[in-house]
Amino acid sequence: MRAIVPAVLIFLTTATGCADRLILHPPANAIAGPGVQRRTLAHDGKTIEVFTARSPGAKNAGPRAFMLEFTGNMTRAEHIIAYVASRWEEHPVETWVINYPGYGGSSGGATLRNIPPAALATYDELRRLAGERPIFVAGQSLGSVPALYVAANRPVAGVIIQNPPAIRDQVWHQHGWWNLWLLAAPVAWQVPRELDSVANAKRAAAPAVILIADRDRVVPPRFQRKVADAYAGEKRVIVQEGAGHESHLDDAGHAKLRDAMDWLFDRATAGG
């Protein structure tokens, strides 16, 4: 027993922060494309880097709505800002994409616990600038997690999430068996409760579009469906048949997403 206790203490010590190291992988370099603007926000003595771009419909007129997008775990804002902004096509929408703390020009450590306050601070600054205009939140994979957190804690006009993980559940149920939960347990415990997507989905009331890849091996569909089933607001679920985690939408998927984004925009701007 005396020999076991030090071994357990050593394991728990080395396991501290392992959730951050296993989940977050900040890329070293990224270049933003044309038409992209860079902003920095000050929050709690740290810098949050945000990249913004406008949809084709907002190039020559002010935006009627805004979208706050969150990236995946191996992605920076520069990688996706032009693409996600362009998806709104003729709808006049300005998109903001945040670099998480420790990513790009955002200061602070790349830790899960640093993501929720940065997400809310960015939303609050966007709300200050947007005034009464609607704000959507969006994210793919890990990005869906802070998107749902914001949707549960701030007024948003709509939510778009793709391949959403239920991180704690997935760590526990998918990975616990092969290490007798000796690694899975501390990793699951280190995921902040603010990033419990199932709990946040239950509190989110805005209309949502949820895309599920039914052959996803990174976030198996049963965990994605757990988030989708928990979502409290009105929702449209788009199942991508035969799609993996990184699969691009096929023509049918694009058409369904386009229709769903029209639905969100029209609802948010009706009478505006």
Located regions from the model:
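Membrane-embedded segments
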Residues: 48-125, 145
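C-terminal catalytic histidine-bearing segment of alpha/beta-hydrolase fold enzymes
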Residues: 225, 229-272
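Short alpha-helix in the alpha/beta-hydrolase fold that links the catalytic acid
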Residues: 83, 196-197, 206, 220-229
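Gly/Ala-rich beta-loop-alpha elbow adjacent to hydrolase catalytic centers
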Residues: 138-143, 147
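Acidic catalytic loop of the alpha/beta-hydrolase fold
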Residues: 214-219, 246-247
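An N-terminal hydrophobic leader/cap segment in hydrolases
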Residues: 8-42, 48-56
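Short beta-strand/loop motif that positions the catalytic acidic residue
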Residues: 203-205, 209-212, 216
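Hydrolase active-site cap/lid region
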Residues: 149-200, 206, 250
